[in-house]
Amino acid sequence: ISLVSCAHRETTYVYGSPLPVADPVFKGVAQIFLDREEGQVTGTAFAFADNGSEIYMLTADHICQEVGRGVIATTIPPHEGTREKYAGRVVYTSEDGDTCILRLEEASGAFEVLRFAPESPRTGDRVYTIGAPSGAFPTKTEGYVVGHDFLGTEADESDDPKMILITSVPAYGGNSGGPVYNERHEVVGMISAVHHEYPHSSISVHVEFLLTHVDIYFKQKSNLYFQ
């Protein structure tokens, strides 16, 4: 199986889709920038917790790669003025789950906290993502849930957390870490990669696996308020 990551390796500040007021997810998504040995990379992240002083965001591990790395998160472009920037650090990574957690300092209230879907998505559900493909942020695209593995099958009824979600949502460099969400604006996954043989499809980390990693991190930080 050949997968291609959706990180973008050139810093670009291109404004994407106009902000639709009706979609609250836009206010919970950030374009992120990290410095690595090969240069600066950019991707997408989304807020999932706010403890009153700090914002916690999820993104893809293949962007972050290591705990302690600095990150800059920027808000959506306003109609007038400049985007706000917030500094933070990588506080959790999981290579096998391609999941990374960021902590933004003094950023409480800067981003809307997105909700996780209480139920697993079903094949045929309409889903959306917001990201920074080729640096164009924010860009919203949509598609449908194809399945929960590379065969396009439904999820089984086991208690094991589902790991991946296949959708027909287009994804390109810069989309990595973007939320995949349903028509109720609930997160059902996170963009991770595109299938090399099927570029019209994207591979996401399933919401159940995201929650597993969130639980692992916050159990280690039990003194923090988790919303």
Question: Could you say what each language-model-derived stretch is?
Answer:
Residues 17-18, 29-57, 85-86, 177, ...:
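A conserved glycine-rich beta-strand in the N-terminal activation segment of trypsin-fold
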Residues 9-20, 70-72, 187-227:
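C-terminal cap/linker of serine protease catalytic domains
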Residues 79, 91-98, 148-165:
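Gly/Ser-enriched beta-turn/beta-hairpin loop segments
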Residues 3-5:
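C-terminal motif of bacterial Sec signal peptides marking the signal peptidase cleavage site
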Residues 13, 17-21, 46-48, 89-91, ...:
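Active-site substrate-binding loop(s) of clan PA
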Residues 112-162, 171-175, 191-202:
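Flexible, gly/ser-rich surface segments that form the specificity/activation loops bordering the active-site cleft
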Residues 46, 170-191:
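Catalytic nucleophile loop of clan PA
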Residues 8-9, 48-96, 193:
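Catalytic-histidine neighborhood of serine endopeptidases
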